[in-house]
Amino acid sequence: MAKLALIEREKKRAKLVAKYAAKRANLKAIIDDQEKSEEERYSARLELQQLPRNANPTRQRNRCAITGRPRGTFRKFGLARNKIREIAFKGEIPGLTKASW
C-alpha cells in the first residue's frame, strides 16, 4: 500500500491539471500559431512558464484506486494487476474470464 501522502499528491495534481487545462491549451495554440507575431508568441511562452508545474499532465502518474501502486496499473480498470487478479478470481468484474486455449 502506497503512503497516503503520495495518493493525495496525485489527486491534487489531477485537480490542477483539470483547472489549468483550457488555459494551457490556449497558450500552446498561440505558441504554435506561426501567423501570430513573435512578441505575442514570446509573451504566451512566458505566461505558460508561470503556470504551476503540477498543472502539466505529463507529471501525473496512474495509480491503483485501491492500493495506490504506481506500476502495473491498467487504465481500463484503474487498478493494479494484483488487485485485478484478486477481484477477477472472485468474479466481481463482469465479463472478465481467465484465458484458456
Swiss-Prot record:
It holds the Pfam family Ribosomal_S14. One of its GO terms (biological process) is translation. Keywords: Ribonucleoprotein, Ribosomal protein, RNA-binding, rRNA-binding. Transmembrane segments: none annotated. It comes from the Bacteria. GO terms for cellular component: cytoplasm; small ribosomal subunit. Signal peptide: none annotated. GO terms for molecular function: rRNA binding; structural constituent of ribosome. Part of the 30S ribosomal subunit. Contacts proteins S3 and S10. Binds 16S rRNA, required for the assembly of 30S particles and may also be responsible for determining the conformation of the 16S rRNA at the A site. Belongs to the universal ribosomal protein uS14 family. This is Small ribosomal subunit protein uS14.
